[in-house]
Amino acid sequence: MEKDCQDIQQLDSEENDHQLSGDDEHGSHVQDPRIENPHWKGQPLSRPFPQRLCSTFRLSLLALAFNILLLVVICVVSSQSIQLQEEFRTLKETFSNFSSSTLMEFGALDTLGGSTNAILTSWLAQLEEKQQQLKADHSTLLFHLKHFPMDLRTLTCQLAYFQSNGTECCPVNWVEFGGSCYWFSRDGLTWAEADQYCQLENAHLLVINSREEQDFVVKHRSQFHIWIGLTDRDGSWKWVDGTDYRSNYRNWAFTQPDNWQGHEQGGGEDCAEILSDGHWNDNFCQQVNRWVCEKRRNITH
């Protein structure tokens, strides 16, 4: 195509040369203004038609080539865009499926976790209940083990008492200690009434001979004042069984005995009692207190 344009331009040049030579031969008076006046500013001479045609054809070819190239680029970009859209759609579906699957798994784990927590809570509650029950059973067992020797001794003593018709061991509901039997009342009497009650049981009001006996009585008498077999009605303190007062064990509270005279009934304090703290006190004999009877354990062979 370019060669054709060159041929056309060559033919056009030859034709121009021929015309110029013809003009010279005929002595034409037509002069080229550009030759006569080098400063001529008129319109440029128009290019011949074949040259203009060749330039337009080149531009058309360039435009066509550019359009083809642009079309190819558009096709390539469109193809890649479609491929990217397809890949994005596939990726989106994959991510959506993954998200749904993950959410389902999390939901299953949450449900399983809730069930597990409920089961663990139930087990912990049952375990705590069993633990409390075991503690209670353990405390009960310790209590029975602690009192088992005493209970066994009491049962053995009661059995021996019945077998020997009351000639051996302590009577029923009496407690043995140090070779003596003790009975602790559950109601109250005056000192004289309590002393008479003990005599009817072939016993006497409590006579304390040692610190050990004092501790034993305090341990079993609860938190009540109790009468003991000690009185000074005749002006001096004496034990009801004849035990010597001066040489025997004593546990008076501070400032006691004081023979206080302020009772409404009149008279002083001539009868001894054990206070709630274990110390002794002289009190008005008509006061109503609990009491303890004591007698020697009978042993016959």
From Swiss-Prot:
<feature type="disulfide bond">
    <location>
        <begin position="271"/>
        <end position="285"/>
    </location>
</feature>
<keyword id="KW-0597">Phosphoprotein</keyword>
<keyword id="KW-0106">Calcium</keyword>
<keyword id="KW-1015">Disulfide bond</keyword>
<keyword id="KW-0564">Palmitate</keyword>
<keyword id="KW-0449">Lipoprotein</keyword>
<feature type="topological domain" description="Extracellular">
    <location>
        <begin position="80"/>
        <end position="301"/>
    </location>
</feature>
<feature type="region of interest" description="Disordered">
    <location>
        <begin position="1"/>
        <end position="43"/>
    </location>
</feature>
<dbReference type="InterPro" id="IPR016186">
    <property type="entry name" value="C-type_lectin-like/link_sf"/>
</dbReference>
<dbReference type="InterPro" id="IPR018378">
    <property type="entry name" value="C-type_lectin_CS"/>
</dbReference>
<feature type="domain" description="C-type lectin">
    <location>
        <begin position="169"/>
        <end position="295"/>
    </location>
</feature>
<comment type="subunit">
    <text>Interacts with LASS2.</text>
</comment>
<dbReference type="Pfam" id="PF03954">
    <property type="entry name" value="Lectin_N"/>
</dbReference>
<dbReference type="GO" id="GO:0031647">
    <property type="term" value="P:regulation of protein stability"/>
</dbReference>
<keyword id="KW-0675">Receptor</keyword>
<keyword id="KW-0735">Signal-anchor</keyword>
<feature type="modified residue" description="Phosphoserine">
    <location>
        <position position="13"/>
    </location>
</feature>
<feature type="glycosylation site" description="N-linked (GlcNAc...) asparagine">
    <location>
        <position position="97"/>
    </location>
</feature>
<keyword id="KW-0472">Membrane</keyword>
<feature type="lipid moiety-binding region" description="S-palmitoyl cysteine">
    <location>
        <position position="54"/>
    </location>
</feature>
<keyword id="KW-0812">Transmembrane</keyword>
<keyword id="KW-0254">Endocytosis</keyword>
<dbReference type="GO" id="GO:0055088">
    <property type="term" value="P:lipid homeostasis"/>
</dbReference>
<dbReference type="InterPro" id="IPR001304">
    <property type="entry name" value="C-type_lectin-like"/>
</dbReference>
<dbReference type="GO" id="GO:0006897">
    <property type="term" value="P:endocytosis"/>
</dbReference>
<feature type="topological domain" description="Cytoplasmic">
    <location>
        <begin position="1"/>
        <end position="58"/>
    </location>
</feature>
<dbReference type="Pfam" id="PF00059">
    <property type="entry name" value="Lectin_C"/>
</dbReference>
<comment type="function">
    <text>Mediates the endocytosis of plasma glycoproteins to which the terminal sialic acid residue on their complex carbohydrate moieties has been removed. The receptor recognizes terminal galactose and N-acetylgalactosamine units. After ligand binding to the receptor, the resulting complex is internalized and transported to a sorting organelle, where receptor and ligand are disassociated. The receptor then returns to the cell membrane surface.</text>
</comment>
<dbReference type="InterPro" id="IPR016187">
    <property type="entry name" value="CTDL_fold"/>
</dbReference>
<dbReference type="GO" id="GO:0030282">
    <property type="term" value="P:bone mineralization"/>
</dbReference>
<feature type="disulfide bond">
    <location>
        <begin position="198"/>
        <end position="293"/>
    </location>
</feature>
<dbReference type="GO" id="GO:0030246">
    <property type="term" value="F:carbohydrate binding"/>
</dbReference>
<dbReference type="GO" id="GO:0009100">
    <property type="term" value="P:glycoprotein metabolic process"/>
</dbReference>
<protein>
    <recommendedName>
        <fullName>Asialoglycoprotein receptor 2</fullName>
    </recommendedName>
</protein>
<keyword id="KW-1133">Transmembrane helix</keyword>
<feature type="disulfide bond">
    <location>
        <begin position="170"/>
        <end position="181"/>
    </location>
</feature>
<feature type="glycosylation site" description="N-linked (GlcNAc...) asparagine">
    <location>
        <position position="165"/>
    </location>
</feature>
<feature type="transmembrane region" description="Helical; Signal-anchor for type II membrane protein">
    <location>
        <begin position="59"/>
        <end position="79"/>
    </location>
</feature>
<keyword id="KW-0430">Lectin</keyword>
<keyword id="KW-0325">Glycoprotein</keyword>
<dbReference type="InterPro" id="IPR033989">
    <property type="entry name" value="CD209-like_CTLD"/>
</dbReference>
<dbReference type="GO" id="GO:0016020">
    <property type="term" value="C:membrane"/>
</dbReference>
